[in-house]
Amino acid sequence: QDIVIAGGGEDEHWSSSSLFDAMGALSSNFNDDPKKASRPYDKNRDGFVISGGSGILILEEEEHAKKRNANILAKLSGYFATSDGYDMVAPSGEGALRCMQGALKSYGSDVDYINTHGTSTPVGDLAELNAIKELFINNSPFISSTKSMTGHSLGATGAQEAIYSIMMLRDKFIAPSINIEDVCDEAKGVKLNTETTSSEIKSAMSNSFGFGGTNASLIVTKY
């Protein structure tokens, strides 16, 4: 198969928001200042901010793309998926660890940057941080969560964050995690990027770790 159109879209609607609110998954402590509500890795994070949107990518066989003089933005160099089924909303972290390990193995090298799943939930952020520290020991790549700026667009977010990662490769920068006023203790052992930083990264991992233990990590590299 030469071309695959891949992506997702999500309409932010009260009917879906209310379900996540009933589960206690959404932030409520910053209702008076909603721009500060999505704060992955801050000690005062209290849930995610639901959003909407869409993202579409064209995955194309390299020689096919060259023949039609396509503008090749990046290469999909690694991928892995796991399903741990530990809990509906509280991840174990083990599935995330295996997922990142598998993606790195398929790529064959370490990465310069991770766009984390980082939704701003107390339990989810902690599990992902612990998995990253266990995987990379004392040599963590730069990490940040673009959800701190965009919110969590559910079914669209995996495609969107792959696009954001490609933009960072192309435009030579690392996006920040914003709203970190008091960084959580667990994040102090990783290279957490809190400002837009000029950096000519060559590879980026994008993590999507959903409710129910469905996990995917993909690695895009500069072309």
Predicted regions and their residues:
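Local beta-strand N-terminus motif with an aromatic residue
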Residues: 1, 110-111, 140, 201
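Conserved beta-strand-centric core segments of catalytic alpha/beta enzyme folds
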Residues: 1-64, 157-223
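Short, active-site-adjacent cap segments at secondary-structure transitions
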Residues: 11-14, 121-123, 150-151
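Condensing-enzyme catalytic core mediating Claisen C-C bond formation in acyl metabolism
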Residues: 34-113
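Short glycine/threonine-rich loop-to-helix capping motif typified by GTGT followed
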Residues: 85-96, 120-136, 153-160, 193
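Stable alpha-helical structural segments in soluble proteins, enriched in small hydrophobic residues
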Residues: 99-107, 131, 135, 161, ...
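Glycine-centered flexible beta-alpha turn that most often forms the glycine-rich phosphate-binding loop
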Residues: 117
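Conserved phosphate-binding/catalytic loops in two-lobed NTP-binding clefts
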Residues: 138-151
